[in-house]
């Protein structure tokens, strides 16, 4: 059985087969998840049985490369371990079914799952048994079943090419890193670029030399109304203030309170509504506005897509498919949004009928992420959602509705003030028509200036010079890293969350104040990959490869050709790395105390979950200890031990007693060593929204709290 979907000549290699069926029963529908199966079965009725494959049923073997390089990069698939009972059950159900429909997700991975199911169940590729829908609603599902299609082998080839390329890179470079650096390391097409971006930014920060500069801000009065203006220049030319001497020269030219209004420039400015969400823009906004990690965003979005029970409405899918780089909105959804906006705010707020241009490279079989039913407002369904589901749904709903509204219009005014050739500029703006801002909060606020005319006089109230220093570029957050990867054409919607997870799991980077900081190990690995595999971390090279893979999806290129084009030069780089890469010894840091088992010095080692203490006499002595941080508070449970800061395997901080397991005290919040004056329970320090901390009672039923601390 050939494992590629097509030969080089693009002729389908799978022969048509005839299946003998027993007495026809129900129509069998196979989806990925049980939650999705439950929703769809209710929509389709008694003549359909919907079952779940629970993700992929076949994959490449984990213990080997599983790609036959000598035979056109043929992937060597096996049934996933532990899925034999499920596969047997699917075969039995398919044999008894009247017809079999494959309704996995509407993307490359979903198409590949359907292709593997067709192979396992011996379904002809010519058969129209593939059903796709972008939202799990009754109408969308029923309409999709009216138009089943063949499995899209181009889409499968694109997925298979990516899978093979990832194997070739990961399973070729990783063993070299194991030999030269340490076990458990990995490299990958997207993760190595993400790591390089983080390391490069850290190098920029370390090399940054702050430069001094100054500003002069003034407060002025027109009658009783005050407004602000900032120094711009001298004698009609912009004049930067680099030193205190520059400031003194300006201040010496100021004489008295009167400033002349030289110029008043009024304009009308339009600000268009934001586009509806793609996967990456949703991830960025969820990180910035909701403080969600990327993985959490995708997990909650999956729940909203697969559906929740909404009282009398029953089980409903709440959003469209959440892995997309399209900003397209269907005409039906546009019409529904128009009706909602016109009803709630008036016709003048709706931009019904306007077309949206997609970003270059967007896979436009999908829509943008939007609510399945715009009339399911966040307030209307809030009681059926948990707090995280409601937060993300509200974000998606607001963004979609705003995207279908007209631009906001601002009146802006720019006023030039001068005295003795010293020029200050005041800028003001006022919302003339709120447009999409009616529903979508924006950071810009109106800054009203008093009405002024040219050649009149205003009074200076005070002028304040202030020293500043230029700041280094900020470290990447999850949101800014995803944005940079997307802007460079690296990766696709489905790759961002697992990429960020992998570079943290390998301890190449750590999150410090929600920003990525490279570890020593990450810097070592990055240096080696940059030196020996420059194309892997070249964003232009990787973006070009993504375009080639998109052409495979469009049927314009053969996947084997694209893989071969990459692998031949890559194989030479592998040979050079095997010969030229020197072995690197990561030195253990002395811990400063001796082993309590054998007396040898303890050292600090780097493991999968971070640093830990270990005996230097390993393997003769295997004594290890967790690195703990005392917070200076006695245990509120046993009153004998000390509270220490610890981390879960997922790197979440919690607090526990150092007498564990004799004392099992734990708390997610930091105890402060005082008891609540109302309930007597111990007090804890909680982080509060908007930054800062607050001391509250650890007893949820007690409302005691102290003032917020910044």
From Swiss-Prot:
Biased composition (Basic residues): 7-22
Single GO MF annotation: DNA binding
Residue numbers annotated as active site: 321
Protein name listed in UniProt: DNA topoisomerase 1
Keyword annotations from UniProtKB, A to Z: DNA-binding, Isomerase, Magnesium, Metal-binding, Repeat, Topoisomerase, Zinc, Zinc-finger
Reactions the enzyme catalyzes: ATP-independent breakage of single-stranded DNA, followed by passage and rejoining
Domain of life of the source: Bacteria
Species assigned in the record: Lactococcus lactis subsp. lactis (strain IL1403)
Lineage, highest ranks first: Bacteria, Bacillati, Bacillota, Bacilli, Lactobacillales
Domain Topo IA-type catalytic: 152-574
Top EC class, one word: isomerase
Residues holding Mg(2+): 32, 105
Enzyme Commission numbers on file: 5.6.2.1
């Amino acid at each position: 059985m050939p494992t590629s979907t097509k030969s080089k000549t693009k002729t389908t290699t799978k022969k048509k087969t005839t299946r003998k069926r027993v007495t026809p029963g129900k129509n069998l529908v196979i989806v990925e998840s049980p939650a999705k199966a439950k929703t769809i079965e209710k929509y389709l009725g008694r003549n359909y049985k919907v079952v779940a494959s629970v993700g992929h049923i076949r994959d490449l073997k984990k213990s080997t490369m599983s790609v036959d390089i000598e035979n056109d990069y043929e992937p060597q698939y096996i049934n996933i371990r532990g899925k034999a009972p499920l596969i047997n059950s699917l075969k039995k159900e398919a044999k008894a079914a009247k017809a079999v429909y494959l309704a996995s997700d509407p993307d490359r991975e979903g198409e590949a799952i359907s292709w593997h199911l067709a192979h396992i169940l011996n379904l002809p590729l010519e058969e129209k048994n593939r059903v796709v829908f972008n939202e799990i609603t009754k109408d969308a599902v029923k309409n999709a079943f009216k138009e089943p299609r063949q499995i899209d082998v181009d889409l499968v080839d694109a997925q298979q090419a990516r899978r093979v390329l990832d194997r070739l890179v990961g399973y070729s470079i990783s063993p070299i890193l194991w030999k030269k650096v340490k076990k458990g390391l990995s490299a990958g097409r997207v993760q190595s670029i993400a790591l390089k971006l983080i390391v490069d930014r850290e190098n920029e920060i370390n090399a940054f030399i702050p430069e001094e500069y100054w500003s002069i801000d003034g407060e002025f009065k027109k009658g009783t109304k005050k407004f602000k203006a900032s120094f711009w220049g001298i004698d009609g030319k912009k004049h930067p203030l680099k030193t205190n001497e520059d400031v003194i020269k300006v201040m010496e030219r100021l004489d008295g309170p009167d400033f002349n209004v030289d110029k008043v420039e009024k304009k009308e400015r339009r600000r268009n509504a934001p586009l509806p969400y793609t996967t990456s823009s949703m991830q960025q906004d969820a990180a910035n506005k909701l403080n969600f990690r990327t993985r959490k965003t995708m997990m909650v979005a999956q729940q909203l897509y697969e559906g929740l029970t909404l009282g009398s409405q029953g089980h409903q899918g709440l959003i469209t498919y959440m892995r997309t780089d399209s900003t397209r909105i269907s005409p039906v959804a546009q019409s529904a949004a128009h009706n909602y906006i016109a009803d709630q705010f008036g016709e003048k707020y709706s931009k019904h009928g306007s077309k949206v241009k997609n970003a270059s490279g967007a896979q436009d079989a999908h829509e943008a992420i939007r609510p399945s039913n715009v009339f399911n407002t966040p307030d209307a369904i809030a009681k059926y959602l948990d707090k995280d589901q409601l937060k993300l749904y509200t974000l998606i709903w607001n963004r979609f509705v705003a995207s279908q509204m007209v631009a906001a219009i601002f009146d802006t005014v720019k006023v030039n003030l001068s005295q003795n050739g010293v020029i200050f500029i005041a800028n003001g703006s006022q919302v003339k028509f709120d447009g999409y801002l009616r529903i979508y909060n924006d950071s810009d606020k109106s800054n009203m200036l008093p009405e002024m005319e040219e050649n009149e006089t205003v009074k200076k109230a005070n002028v304040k010079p202030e020293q500043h220093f230029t700041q280094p570029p900020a470290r990447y957050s999850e949101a800014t890293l995803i944005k940079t990867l997307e802007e460079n054409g690296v990766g696709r919607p489905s790759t961002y969350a697992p990429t960020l997870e992998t570079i943290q799991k390998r301890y190449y980077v750590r999150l410090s104040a929600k920003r990525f900081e490279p570890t020593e190990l990450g810097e070592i690995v990055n240096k080696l990959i940059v030196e020996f595999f420059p194309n892997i971390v070249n964003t232009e090279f990787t973006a070009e490869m993504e375009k080639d893979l998109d052409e495979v999806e469009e049927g314009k290129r053969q996947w084997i050709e694209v893989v071969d084009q990459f692998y031949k030069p890559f194989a030479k780089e592998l040979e050079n790395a095997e010969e030229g890469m020197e072995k690197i010894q990561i030195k253990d840091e002395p811990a400063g105390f001796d082993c309590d088992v054998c007396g040898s010095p303890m050292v600090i080692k780097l493991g999968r979950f971070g640093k830990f203490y270990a005996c230097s006499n390993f393997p003769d002595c295997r004594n290890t200890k967790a690195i703990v941080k005392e917070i200076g508070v006695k245990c509120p449970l046993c009153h004998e031990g000390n509270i220490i800061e610890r981390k879960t395997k997922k790197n979440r901080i919690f607090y526990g007693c150092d007498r564990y397991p004799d004392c099992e005290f734990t708390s997610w919040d930091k105890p402060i060593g005082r008891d609540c004056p109302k309930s007597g329970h111990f007090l804890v320090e909680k982080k509060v929204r908007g930054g800062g901390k607050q001391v509250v009672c650890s007893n949820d039923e007690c409302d005691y709290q102290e003032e917020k601390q910044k």
